[in-house]
């Protein structure tokens, strides 16, 4: 694990948050939708980014199996009852499977690594394919972190 890659910030006021961030001078990526119900927009900084996540398609949120971490389900649950703010810290890694093993050795609850790809529109309008391989860890003492 090399360091902090980005934070995930949940919001039910996605358009208003994007307008506020643009108004104070940030450039955001165009809104994108994930195939599992969530959508996002990013503020990309040098070596770090902020991911604003919302739930445009709650009917697409799958219920995770016991050994799976449900990114969409976790964030949908986080936003219940008005939950807003940083829901996740995401660290850099070149090897999700090795990170999962490290999490197990540290006594954290782990899940099967999760990989997906999607088209992403860049600020200049270009569409590129982006892909991710993720290892998730949770701990009972931190149910909302």
Where are these regions (language model features)?
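Vicinal oxygen chelate
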Residues: 2-13, 41-46, 49-51, 62-145
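Glycine/small-residue-rich interface belts in oligomeric ring/scaffold proteins
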Residues: 18-78
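Amphipathic alpha-helical segments
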Residues: 14-27, 99-106
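N-terminal start-of-chain detector that recognizes signal peptides
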Residues: 1, 13-16, 23-25, 59-65, ...
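Generic detector of short, locally flexible boundary/turn motifs and exposed helical patches
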Residues: 6-10, 15-19, 51-57, 111-115, ...
């Amino acid at each position: 694990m090399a360091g902090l890659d980005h934070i995930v910030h949940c919001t039910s006021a996605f358009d208003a948050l994007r307008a506020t961030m643009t108004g104070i001078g940030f450039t955001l990526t165009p809104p994108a939708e994930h195939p599992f119900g969530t959508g996002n927009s990013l503020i990309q900084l040098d070596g770090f980014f902020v991911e604003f996540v919302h739930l445009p398609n709650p009917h697409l949120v799958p219920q995770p199996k016991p050994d799976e971490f449900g990114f969409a389900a976790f964030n949908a649950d986080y936003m219940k009852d008005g939950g807003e703010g940083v829901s996740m810290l995401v660290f850099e890694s070149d090897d999700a499977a090795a990170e999962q093993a490290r999490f197990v050795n540290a006594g954290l609850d782990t899940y099967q690594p999760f990989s997906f790809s999607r088209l992403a529109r860049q600020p200049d309008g270009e569409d590129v394919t982006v892909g991710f391989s993720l290892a998730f860890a949770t701990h009972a003492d931190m149910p909302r972190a």
